[in-house]
């Protein structure tokens, strides 16, 4: 098809209900064989939350929801049911025993201690964070088996008794420089032991630059650009591609200065592959209590009271599925569904509507520009078994599990060696790099171009 170069947000504000709760909105999910030097045999999972964070998002910036359960799930045997889950629960605290820092205001004899309105009152570094007025901590729980009924084990850092999250990047007056902030954030990488696992795992939670690339505004304005490569090859800069076509430029990336909050876990592959064939499926979810009652006299510690069963409100495995495949009336249903129940969404995969929508938008313009009489720009191979393989079953010999249960998740073959960062192809398997998407997903994989070529 001629129309192949659109860029879409992977899962930013993808369903009506989740737009009302950005703190539990999963934006992207990654699973890959670790390629950092010295980390052979490890698998990294990254779940990004809270989309479209502005660098100037003060004074409160972007804290995680203390009422939520954030989870990374792993299916090691292909039955579409989690075998291992890592669950994050956050606690937000103010300095001075949760009262907040107060400063003496006024002259002697008429002085009052008054609380400050900011999250810090001075510089912060890896060596000294005493000026911080706000902090986030989190517990990490491993659930073996079903998320609801499985065995729960509280995990703790090898040093200390609580995991902590760095403050968001406030600016250079607070952190001196981006390099110093990086050093500060690195001090929040923790090692922890997994029961029955010989080697240590690692975890990090903190604000990162959003690695996804998207022309967000124009894309959802009915693709308000020519969605075909305008150069002879991406980045060539010669203008010898499709007449008037879009070219590769940072000017087209509406997420260039946006951040997300990453929940990252790196574990030995042998600890999550179980008795399967080395291929694992994974996804992330966020859940909230069913009921919330607002406190009419809200305080920092108790703005509301929540109760009832934890209810899944966000879900993300493979990129683009809920964003571009699921119909708008079923997006919230997908967000709350379990992979084992994905049969209800089969028609969206076997007979997707997006290609036909693009055909309606661009067929006449393409024929006019090229002087052709193309009958349709959309694929005609129905049912779309190619999409079923890409999103629901995995590719035989690459990332298909021994037991095949059609379900949407990100599948990774842990037996395929990681490709060093400098040698990776952004096109993953399509670029002869078997360690990339759709065999898992790395932050640098160009999932849009890959998916639109399936």
Model-derived regions: residue spans:
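Surface-exposed extracytoplasmic segments
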Residues: 8-454
């Amino acid at each position: 098809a001629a129309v192949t170069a659109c860029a879409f947000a992977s899962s930013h504000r993808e369903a009506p209900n989740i737009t009302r709760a950005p703190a539990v909105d999963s934006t992207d999910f990654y699973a890959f064989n670790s390629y950092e030097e010295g980390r052979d045999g490890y698998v990294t999972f990254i779940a990004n939350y809270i989309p479209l964070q502005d660098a100037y998002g003060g004074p409160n910036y972007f804290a995680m929801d203390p009422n939520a359960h954030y989870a990374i799930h792993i299916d090691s045997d292909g039955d579409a049911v989690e075998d291992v889950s890592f669950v994050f629960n956050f606690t937000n605290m103010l300095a001075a025993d949760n009262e907040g820092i107060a400063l003496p205001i006024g002259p002697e004899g008429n002085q009052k201690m008054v609380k400050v309105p900011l999250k810090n009152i001075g510089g912060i570094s890896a060596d000294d964070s005493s000026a911080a007025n706000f902090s986030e901590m989190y517990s990490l729980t491993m659930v073996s088996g079903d998320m609801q009924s499985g065995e729960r084990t509280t995990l703790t850092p090898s040093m200390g008794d609580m995991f902590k999250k760095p403050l968001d990047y406030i600016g250079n007056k607070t952190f001196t420089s981006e390099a110093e902030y990086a050093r500060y954030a690195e001090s929040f990488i923790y090692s922890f032991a997994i029961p029955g696992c010989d080697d240590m795992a690692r975890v990090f939670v903190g604000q990162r630059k959003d690695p996804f690339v998207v022309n967000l505004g124009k894309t959802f304005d009915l693709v308000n650009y020519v969605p075909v490569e305008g150069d002879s090859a991406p980045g060539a800069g010669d203008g010898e591609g499709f007449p008037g076509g879009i070219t590769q430029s940072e000017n087209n990336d509406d997420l260039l200065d946006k951040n997300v909050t990453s929940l990252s876990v790196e574990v030995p592959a042998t600890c999550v592959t179980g008795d399967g064939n080395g291929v694992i499926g994974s996804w992330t979810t966020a859940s909230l209590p069913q009921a919330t009652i607002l406190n009419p006299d809200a305080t920092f510690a108790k703005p509301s009271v929540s109760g009832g069963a934890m209810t899944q409100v966000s879900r993300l495995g493979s990129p683009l599925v809920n964003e571009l495949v699921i119909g708008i009336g079923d997006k919230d249903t997908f967000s709350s569904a379990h992979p084992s129940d994905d049969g209800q969404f089969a028609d969206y995969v076997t007979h997707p509507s997006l290609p036909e929508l693009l055909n309606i938008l661009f067929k006449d313009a393409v024929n006019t520009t090229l002087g052709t009489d193309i009958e349709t720009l959309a694929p005609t191979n129905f049912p779309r078994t190619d999409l079923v393989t890409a999103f629901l079953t995995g590719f035989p010999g690459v990332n298909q599990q021994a037991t095949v249960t059609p379900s949407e998740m990100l599948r990774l073959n842990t037996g395929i060696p990681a490709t060093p960062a400098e040698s990776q192809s952004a096109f993953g398997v399509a670029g002869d790099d078997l360690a990339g998407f759709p065999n898992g997903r790395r932050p640098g994989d160009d999932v849009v171009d890959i998916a639109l070529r399936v």
